[in-house]
Amino acid sequence: MTPRVLGLMSGTSADGIDAALLELPGWPPTGSGGIFPALSGGVPRGRVAEHVFTPFPPELREAVLAAMQSGLDAADLTQLHWWLGEALAEAAAPLAPHADLIASHGQTVQHHPRPDPRRGWTRPATLQLGEVALIAERTGKPVVADFRPADMAAGGLGAPLVPFADWALFAEGGVRRAIHNLGGISNLTFLPGLDRDEVQAFDTGPGNCLLDEVAALAGQACDEGGRLAAAGQVHTETLAAWLAHPELQVPPPKATGREVWTLARLPRPADLGLPDLAATATAFTARTVADAYARWVVPQGLDEVVVAGGGARNPALLAAIRSALSPLPLRTFTEVGWAAQGLTDATREAAAFAFLGYARAQGWANTLPRTTGARHAVSAGKWLLPPSLPETLA
């Protein structure tokens, strides 16, 4: 029987939940013996049979964004944890009957991969909300969740985790490919071939998060179609100031979040209009992407960049990145043929966590120490188990 795993993902854009039912024909290979098998065959090595996006109601999104900015007290944070658990269970409901297992990333509201003495923080920490027991109770399925802490306990940054699934599903011999995610935060996975020890991945900086903040100031959920940015002009002094941010000088492995990339922490003239602010944020995001490739990936040899995430549907942002990366080809999941298997810019992250959950069920290590900086790989994810596992996972 073909394993079927339902991945649930709500990213740093906090716009809603992607539920992707990942089918894995041919997994696990015969005789894998509990050790992750060598990759073979064409890509992708899986397909998304069904996908449902459930948007957050405005009041839930506002609460999530407030938690990201440390704007909730302990009682409100506890309420939000259960509210998100209910939302995840509801998002899973249409597809759960077809799944053997559910893998839930949860909603990251705080991620501090390194101690910060300036704030009196002496240890790394991360927090993903969304009570898993609610998902298990309402779907009747085993659930794997809370993937990041195991890597951090092993000395890693707890991110990025998606690159393990990128490697398993998309790595191809003879092709030096990067998969770039433009979610709330921008990150890349560099796949130089089939060897997982050569995979490189890191956060490059903001993705959609600054643009979403500008859009919110304009009374919009996002800069739909990049129209706000297209109506403005880049403010060169502000762009230069932002590009001097010390976070951009940190070499990989590195992870970042909205707590770093927010307008509240970036200087700008008080009279800068919203269209110009959007244009500047777009140019800044594109430059941080291009600079990351130029410094840390292109020197190793790179054939193409395949873009995913909500930012892939922003024409202004995509055009700015394409121009900044030139002459490197920038392609979409549709253009490389993966969308025909249901793997699109919208489903990639949910499918990735579905695969991480599947690997956890197999007992495989599902992290890449080179990308997170951990001392060793771990089998990440916490279980909420039913009395017995489905046949396809046992």
Curated annotation (Swiss-Prot):
ATP binds at G11, T12, S13, A14, D15, G16, I17, D18. It holds the Pfam family AnmK. Keywords: ATP-binding, Carbohydrate metabolism, Kinase, Nucleotide-binding, Plasmid, Transferase. InterPro entries: Anhydro_N_Ac-Mur_kinase, ATPase_NBD. It catalyses: 1,6-anhydro-N-acetyl-beta-muramate + ATP + H2O = N-acetyl-D-muramate 6-phosphate + ADP + H(+). Its EC number is 2.7.1.170. GO terms for biological process: 1,6-anhydro-N-acetyl-beta-muramic acid catabolic process; amino sugar metabolic process; peptidoglycan turnover. Pathway: Amino-sugar metabolism; 1,6-anhydro-N-acetylmuramate degradation; Cell wall biogenesis; peptidoglycan recycling. One of its GO terms (molecular function) is phosphotransferase activity, alcohol group as acceptor. Belongs to the anhydro-N-acetylmuramic acid kinase family. PANTHER family: ANHYDRO-N-ACETYLMURAMIC ACID KINASE. Catalyzes the specific phosphorylation of 1,6-anhydro-N-acetylmuramic acid (anhMurNAc) with the simultaneous cleavage of the 1,6-anhydro ring, generating MurNAc-6-P. Is required for the utilization of anhMurNAc either imported from the medium or derived from its own cell wall murein, and thus plays a role in cell wall recycling. This is Anhydro-N-acetylmuramic acid kinase.
